[in-house]
Protein backbone atom coordinates (compact mmCIF):
# COMPACT_ATOMS: atom_id res chain seq x y z
CA UNK A 1 0.00 0.00 0.00
CA UNK A 2 1.55 3.23 -1.16
CA UNK A 3 0.55 5.82 1.44
CA UNK A 4 2.16 8.86 -0.14
CA UNK A 5 -1.04 10.49 -1.42
CA UNK A 6 -3.29 9.46 1.48
CA UNK A 7 -1.32 9.46 4.73
CA UNK A 8 -2.24 12.60 6.69
CA UNK A 9 -0.74 11.38 9.97
CA UNK A 10 2.71 12.98 9.70
CA UNK A 11 4.43 9.86 11.09
CA UNK A 12 6.86 9.44 8.18
CA UNK A 13 5.22 6.23 6.93
CA UNK A 14 5.27 6.10 3.12
CA UNK A 15 4.57 2.45 2.36
CA UNK A 16 3.45 -0.78 4.05
CA UNK A 17 3.35 -4.25 2.52
CA UNK A 18 3.39 -7.92 3.51
CA UNK A 19 5.94 -10.46 2.37
CA UNK A 20 4.85 -13.44 0.26
CA UNK A 21 3.39 -15.57 3.09
CA UNK A 22 2.24 -12.58 5.21
CA UNK A 23 4.55 -13.67 8.04
CA UNK A 24 6.31 -10.29 7.93
CA UNK A 25 5.49 -6.78 6.78
CA UNK A 26 7.84 -4.02 5.69
CA UNK A 27 7.46 -0.25 5.97
CA UNK A 28 9.05 2.45 3.84
CA UNK A 29 9.76 5.59 5.86
CA UNK A 30 10.92 9.17 5.25
CA UNK A 31 14.21 8.10 6.87
CA UNK A 32 14.71 4.44 5.90
CA UNK A 33 12.75 1.21 6.24
CA UNK A 34 11.59 -1.25 8.89
CA UNK A 35 10.64 -4.93 8.94
CA UNK A 36 8.26 -6.51 11.44
CA UNK A 37 7.09 -10.00 12.29
CA UNK A 38 3.33 -9.97 11.68
CA UNK A 39 1.98 -12.32 14.35
CA UNK A 40 3.10 -11.98 17.05
CA UNK A 41 4.09 -8.38 16.34
CA UNK A 42 7.82 -7.76 16.72
CA UNK A 43 10.24 -5.34 15.10
CA UNK A 44 12.87 -7.37 13.23
CA UNK A 45 14.88 -4.71 11.41
CA UNK A 46 15.20 -0.93 11.49
CA UNK A 47 17.44 0.68 8.88
CA UNK A 48 17.70 4.45 9.21
CA UNK A 49 19.21 6.75 6.62
CA UNK A 50 20.35 10.23 7.62
CA UNK A 51 18.64 11.69 4.61
CA UNK A 52 16.45 9.63 2.39
CA UNK A 53 12.94 8.28 2.05
CA UNK A 54 11.96 4.80 0.84
CA UNK A 55 8.67 4.72 -1.05
CA UNK A 56 8.53 0.98 -1.73
CA UNK A 57 9.94 -2.06 0.09
CA UNK A 58 9.53 -5.56 -1.29
CA UNK A 59 10.64 -8.55 0.76
CA UNK A 60 11.56 -12.04 -0.43
CA UNK A 61 10.03 -14.21 2.31
CA UNK A 62 12.48 -13.72 5.23
CA UNK A 63 15.73 -13.74 3.28
CA UNK A 64 18.31 -10.94 3.44
CA UNK A 65 17.43 -9.38 0.07
CA UNK A 66 14.90 -6.55 -0.22
CA UNK A 67 13.96 -4.37 -3.19
CA UNK A 68 13.90 -0.65 -2.40
CA UNK A 69 12.63 2.33 -4.40
CA UNK A 70 13.19 5.90 -3.25
CA UNK A 71 10.22 8.06 -2.24
CA UNK A 72 8.98 10.82 0.02
CA UNK A 73 10.14 14.41 0.35
CA UNK A 74 13.83 13.54 -0.06
CA UNK A 75 14.10 10.14 -1.78
CA UNK A 76 17.10 8.03 -0.75
CA UNK A 77 17.33 6.69 -4.31
CA UNK A 78 16.01 8.08 -7.62
CA UNK A 79 12.39 6.97 -8.10
CA UNK A 80 13.31 5.49 -11.49
CA UNK A 81 15.73 2.96 -9.94
CA UNK A 82 15.26 -0.39 -8.22
CA UNK A 83 17.88 -1.07 -5.56
CA UNK A 84 18.38 -4.59 -4.19
CA UNK A 85 19.49 -4.28 -0.57
CA UNK A 86 21.52 -7.01 1.14
CA UNK A 87 20.61 -6.78 4.80
CA UNK A 88 23.61 -8.88 5.86
CA UNK A 89 26.04 -6.48 4.19
CA UNK A 90 23.84 -3.43 4.98
CA UNK A 91 24.24 -2.05 1.49
CA UNK A 92 22.76 -2.16 -2.00
CA UNK A 93 24.22 -4.89 -4.21
CA UNK A 94 22.13 -4.57 -7.40
CA UNK A 95 20.84 -1.47 -9.18
CA UNK A 96 18.46 -1.36 -12.16
CA UNK A 97 17.64 1.96 -13.83
CA UNK A 98 14.60 2.84 -15.96
CA UNK A 99 13.53 5.81 -18.05
CA UNK A 100 10.33 6.31 -16.03
CA UNK A 101 9.27 6.09 -12.39
CA UNK A 102 9.05 2.64 -10.81
CA UNK A 103 5.52 1.92 -9.53
CA UNK A 104 6.17 -1.44 -7.81
CA UNK A 105 8.60 -4.36 -7.56
CA UNK A 106 7.87 -8.06 -7.06
CA UNK A 107 10.44 -10.72 -6.17
CA UNK A 108 10.79 -14.47 -6.29
CA UNK A 109 14.00 -16.43 -5.82
CA UNK A 110 14.85 -16.41 -9.53
CA UNK A 111 13.15 -13.23 -10.82
CA UNK A 112 12.89 -9.48 -10.31
CA UNK A 113 9.66 -8.02 -11.72
CA UNK A 114 9.48 -4.24 -12.13
CA UNK A 115 6.19 -2.43 -12.72
CA UNK A 116 6.22 0.83 -14.69
CA UNK A 117 3.13 2.91 -15.50
CA UNK A 118 2.29 1.07 -18.72
CA UNK A 119 4.60 -1.95 -18.86
CA UNK A 120 6.13 -4.71 -16.76
CA UNK A 121 9.73 -5.86 -17.13
CA UNK A 122 11.04 -9.22 -15.89
CA UNK A 123 14.73 -9.77 -15.03
CA UNK A 124 16.87 -12.61 -13.75
CA UNK A 125 17.64 -12.32 -10.03
CA UNK A 126 21.41 -12.33 -10.54
CA UNK A 127 24.26 -9.96 -9.71
CA UNK A 128 23.94 -8.52 -13.23
CA UNK A 129 20.20 -8.80 -13.95
CA UNK A 130 19.33 -9.79 -17.51
CA UNK A 131 16.02 -8.61 -19.00
CA UNK A 132 13.91 -11.61 -20.03
CA UNK A 133 10.43 -10.27 -20.84
CA UNK A 134 8.47 -7.07 -21.37
CA UNK A 135 4.66 -7.04 -21.06
CA UNK A 136 2.43 -4.12 -22.00
CA UNK A 137 -0.36 -3.08 -19.64
CA UNK A 138 -3.03 -0.42 -19.61
CA UNK A 139 -2.14 2.72 -17.63
CA UNK A 140 -1.27 1.29 -14.21
CA UNK A 141 -0.44 4.11 -11.76
CA UNK A 142 -1.03 1.87 -8.71
CA UNK A 143 1.57 -0.61 -9.94
CA UNK A 144 -0.85 -3.55 -9.77
CA UNK A 145 0.97 -6.84 -10.25
CA UNK A 146 1.18 -10.15 -8.38
CA UNK A 147 3.83 -12.84 -8.70
CA UNK A 148 3.21 -16.36 -7.42
CA UNK A 149 5.94 -17.24 -4.89
CA UNK A 150 5.41 -21.00 -5.23
CA UNK A 151 8.53 -22.74 -6.60
CA UNK A 152 6.29 -24.93 -8.80
CA UNK A 153 4.25 -22.07 -10.26
CA UNK A 154 5.79 -19.05 -12.03
CA UNK A 155 2.49 -17.24 -12.60
CA UNK A 156 2.54 -13.48 -13.09
CA UNK A 157 -0.73 -11.51 -13.05
CA UNK A 158 -1.20 -7.88 -14.07
CA UNK A 159 -3.73 -5.53 -15.72
CA UNK A 160 -4.16 -6.29 -19.42
CA UNK A 161 -4.18 -3.69 -22.16
CA UNK A 162 -8.00 -3.52 -22.03
CA UNK A 163 -9.67 -1.78 -19.07
CA UNK A 164 -10.79 -4.20 -16.34
CA UNK A 165 -8.94 -7.18 -17.83
CA UNK A 166 -6.36 -9.28 -15.96
CA UNK A 167 -3.59 -11.04 -17.86
CA UNK A 168 -1.98 -14.22 -16.49
CA UNK A 169 1.41 -15.28 -17.83
CA UNK A 170 3.43 -18.38 -16.93
CA UNK A 171 7.02 -17.12 -16.74
CA UNK A 172 8.30 -20.70 -17.03
CA UNK A 173 6.72 -21.10 -20.48
CA UNK A 174 5.99 -17.71 -22.02
CA UNK A 175 5.45 -19.33 -25.42
CA UNK A 176 2.03 -20.41 -24.12
CA UNK A 177 -0.67 -17.81 -24.81
CA UNK A 178 -1.57 -15.79 -21.70
CA UNK A 179 -4.92 -16.25 -19.97
CA UNK A 180 -6.98 -13.08 -20.39
CA UNK A 181 -9.76 -12.52 -17.84
CA UNK A 182 -12.37 -9.77 -18.43
CA UNK A 183 -12.74 -9.35 -14.67
CA UNK A 184 -14.55 -5.99 -14.45
CA UNK A 185 -16.05 -3.30 -16.66
CA UNK A 186 -14.22 -0.55 -14.77
CA UNK A 187 -10.55 0.07 -13.98
CA UNK A 188 -8.92 -2.51 -11.68
CA UNK A 189 -8.03 -1.34 -8.18
CA UNK A 190 -6.70 -4.53 -6.56
CA UNK A 191 -5.60 -8.07 -7.52
CA UNK A 192 -4.36 -10.93 -5.33
CA UNK A 193 -3.16 -14.50 -5.88
CA UNK A 194 -3.36 -17.33 -3.39
CA UNK A 195 -0.04 -18.90 -2.34
CA UNK A 196 -0.46 -21.83 -4.72
CA UNK A 197 -1.27 -19.56 -7.68
CA UNK A 198 -4.52 -21.39 -8.49
CA UNK A 199 -6.93 -18.55 -7.63
CA UNK A 200 -6.94 -14.82 -8.34
CA UNK A 201 -9.19 -12.26 -6.61
CA UNK A 202 -9.98 -8.92 -8.25
CA UNK A 203 -11.74 -5.64 -7.49
CA UNK A 204 -12.47 -2.60 -9.64
CA UNK A 205 -12.32 1.08 -8.70
CA UNK A 206 -16.05 0.88 -7.88
CA UNK A 207 -15.09 -1.52 -5.08
CA UNK A 208 -18.49 -3.11 -4.47
CA UNK A 209 -17.71 -6.58 -5.87
CA UNK A 210 -14.83 -9.00 -5.35
CA UNK A 211 -14.49 -11.70 -7.98
CA UNK A 212 -12.48 -14.92 -7.67
CA UNK A 213 -11.28 -16.73 -10.80
CA UNK A 214 -9.53 -20.00 -11.55
CA UNK A 215 -6.10 -19.07 -12.93
CA UNK A 216 -5.73 -22.01 -15.33
CA UNK A 217 -9.07 -21.60 -17.10
CA UNK A 218 -9.96 -17.99 -16.28
CA UNK A 219 -13.44 -19.11 -15.20
CA UNK A 220 -15.33 -17.15 -12.53
CA UNK A 221 -15.63 -19.18 -9.32
CA UNK A 222 -17.29 -16.69 -6.98
CA UNK A 223 -18.66 -13.17 -6.93
CA UNK A 224 -18.71 -11.57 -3.49
CA UNK A 225 -20.29 -8.28 -2.45
CA UNK A 226 -18.30 -6.00 -0.16
CA UNK A 227 -21.06 -3.41 0.01
CA UNK A 228 -23.57 -1.37 -1.95
CA UNK A 229 -21.65 1.91 -1.86
CA UNK A 230 -18.49 2.54 -3.87
CA UNK A 231 -15.20 2.11 -1.99
CA UNK A 232 -11.48 2.26 -2.63
CA UNK A 233 -10.16 -1.27 -2.03
CA UNK A 234 -6.72 -1.13 -0.38
CA UNK A 235 -5.99 -4.81 0.00
CA UNK A 236 -7.21 -8.35 -0.71
CA UNK A 237 -5.46 -11.42 0.71
CA UNK A 238 -6.16 -15.16 0.81
CA UNK A 239 -5.43 -17.32 3.84
CA UNK A 240 -2.92 -20.20 3.60
CA UNK A 241 -5.28 -22.76 2.05
CA UNK A 242 -7.29 -20.19 0.02
CA UNK A 243 -10.52 -21.05 1.84
CA UNK A 244 -10.95 -17.44 3.06
CA UNK A 245 -10.16 -13.93 1.85
CA UNK A 246 -9.96 -10.65 3.74
CA UNK A 247 -10.60 -7.25 2.13
CA UNK A 248 -9.87 -3.73 3.42
CA UNK A 249 -11.25 -0.47 2.02
CA UNK A 250 -11.47 3.26 2.69
CA UNK A 251 -14.71 2.67 4.62
CA UNK A 252 -12.52 1.61 7.55
CA UNK A 253 -13.90 -1.93 7.47
CA UNK A 254 -12.17 -5.28 6.97
CA UNK A 255 -14.46 -7.96 5.49
CA UNK A 256 -13.88 -11.72 5.70
CA UNK A 257 -15.41 -13.98 3.04
CA UNK A 258 -15.49 -17.74 2.52
CA UNK A 259 -13.75 -18.30 -0.82
CA UNK A 260 -14.36 -22.07 -1.15
CA UNK A 261 -17.59 -22.66 0.79
CA UNK A 262 -20.10 -20.03 -0.40
CA UNK A 263 -22.75 -21.26 2.05
CA UNK A 264 -20.74 -19.64 4.88
CA UNK A 265 -21.27 -16.18 3.38
CA UNK A 266 -24.39 -14.21 4.21
CA UNK A 267 -27.18 -13.92 1.67
CA UNK A 268 -30.50 -12.11 1.56
CA UNK A 269 -33.61 -14.13 2.42
CA UNK A 270 -34.91 -12.91 -0.96
CA UNK A 271 -31.97 -14.47 -2.84
CA UNK A 272 -34.07 -17.17 -4.50
CA UNK A 273 -36.61 -14.73 -5.94
CA UNK A 274 -35.78 -14.77 -9.65
CA UNK A 275 -37.73 -11.58 -10.41
CA UNK A 276 -35.52 -9.44 -8.13
CA UNK A 277 -32.30 -7.72 -9.27
CA UNK A 278 -29.00 -9.61 -9.01
CA UNK A 279 -28.11 -7.49 -5.93
CA UNK A 280 -30.50 -9.52 -3.78
CA UNK A 281 -28.71 -12.79 -4.60
CA UNK A 282 -25.32 -11.35 -3.60
CA UNK A 283 -23.03 -13.20 -1.23
CA UNK A 284 -21.88 -10.91 1.60
CA UNK A 285 -19.02 -11.32 4.06
CA UNK A 286 -19.73 -13.70 6.94
CA UNK A 287 -17.61 -11.58 9.28
CA UNK A 288 -16.30 -8.02 9.39
CA UNK A 289 -14.72 -5.58 11.80
CA UNK A 290 -14.25 -1.84 11.93
CA UNK A 291 -10.72 -0.45 12.25
CA UNK A 292 -11.25 1.98 15.18
CA UNK A 293 -9.17 4.77 13.68
CA UNK A 294 -10.70 4.40 10.21
CA UNK A 295 -7.18 4.84 8.85
CA UNK A 296 -6.15 3.27 5.49
CA UNK A 297 -4.94 -0.27 6.16
CA UNK A 298 -3.71 -3.52 4.67
CA UNK A 299 -4.92 -6.86 6.04
CA UNK A 300 -3.87 -10.50 6.15
CA UNK A 301 -4.62 -13.65 8.11
CA UNK A 302 -2.53 -14.31 11.23
CA UNK A 303 -0.85 -17.46 12.51
CA UNK A 304 -4.15 -18.71 13.97
CA UNK A 305 -6.73 -19.68 11.33
CA UNK A 306 -9.34 -17.37 12.90
CA UNK A 307 -7.10 -14.28 13.19
CA UNK A 308 -6.90 -11.27 10.88
CA UNK A 309 -4.24 -8.57 11.17
CA UNK A 310 -4.70 -4.94 10.06
CA UNK A 311 -1.67 -2.65 9.53
CA UNK A 312 -2.77 0.99 9.40
CA UNK A 313 -1.35 4.22 7.98
CA UNK A 314 -1.54 5.89 11.40
CA UNK A 315 0.89 3.29 12.81
CA UNK A 316 -1.80 1.15 14.44
CA UNK A 317 -1.64 -2.65 14.53
CA UNK A 318 -4.82 -4.62 15.19
CA UNK A 319 -5.37 -8.33 15.58
CA UNK A 320 -8.98 -9.48 15.47
CA UNK A 321 -10.30 -12.98 16.15
CA UNK A 322 -13.49 -14.26 14.51
CA UNK A 323 -15.58 -17.35 15.28
CA UNK A 324 -17.63 -19.61 12.94
CA UNK A 325 -20.71 -17.42 13.58
CA UNK A 326 -18.81 -14.40 12.25
CA UNK A 327 -18.52 -12.63 15.61
CA UNK A 328 -15.31 -10.59 15.96
CA UNK A 329 -13.31 -9.46 18.97
CA UNK A 330 -10.20 -7.31 19.15
CA UNK A 331 -7.33 -9.36 20.58
CA UNK A 332 -4.27 -7.09 20.20
CA UNK A 333 -3.69 -3.39 19.64
CA UNK A 334 -0.26 -1.75 19.32
CA UNK A 335 1.52 1.23 17.77
CA UNK A 336 4.16 -0.51 15.64
CA UNK A 337 6.10 2.64 14.72
CA UNK A 338 6.80 3.30 18.40
CA UNK A 339 8.21 -0.17 19.05
CA UNK A 340 11.86 -1.04 19.44
CA UNK A 341 13.32 -4.45 18.64
CA UNK A 342 13.61 -5.40 22.32
CA UNK A 343 9.87 -4.97 22.90
CA UNK A 344 7.25 -7.56 22.08
From Swiss-Prot:
Gene3D superfamilies recorded: YVTN repeat-like/Quinoprotein amine dehydrogenase
UniProt main location, coarse: other
GO biological process annotation, one example: cellular response to starvation
Family annotation (SUPFAM superfamilies): WD40 repeat-like
GO annotations of cellular component type: cytosol; lysosome; phagophore assembly site; phagophore assembly site membrane
Expression sites (tissue/organ): Ubiquitously expressed. Highly expressed in heart, skeletal muscle and pancreas. Up-regulated in a variety of tumor tissues including ovarian and uterine cancers.
Effect of residue 204 to A: Abolished binding to phosphoinositides
Annotated phenotype, changing residue 208 to A: Abolished binding to phosphoinositides
Effect listed in the UniProt record for changing residue 184 to A: Abolished binding to phosphoinositides
Family: Belongs to the WD repeat PROPPIN family.
PANTHER family per the UniProt record, alphabetical: WD-REPEAT PROTEIN INTERACTING WITH PHOSPHOINOSIDES WIPI -RELATED
Name this protein carries in UniProt: WD repeat domain phosphoinositide-interacting protein 3
Annotated organism of origin: Homo sapiens (Human)
Amino acid sequence: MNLLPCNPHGNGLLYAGFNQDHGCFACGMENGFRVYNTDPLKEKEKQEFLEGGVGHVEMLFRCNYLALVGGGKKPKYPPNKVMIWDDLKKKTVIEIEFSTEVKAVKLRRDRIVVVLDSMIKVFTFTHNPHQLHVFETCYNPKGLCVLCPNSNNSLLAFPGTHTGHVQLVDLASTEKPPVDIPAHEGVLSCIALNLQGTRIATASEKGTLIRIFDTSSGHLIQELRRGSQAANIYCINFNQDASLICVSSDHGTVHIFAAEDPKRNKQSSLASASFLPKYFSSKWSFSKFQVPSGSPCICAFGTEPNAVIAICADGSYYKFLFNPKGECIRDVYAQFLEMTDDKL
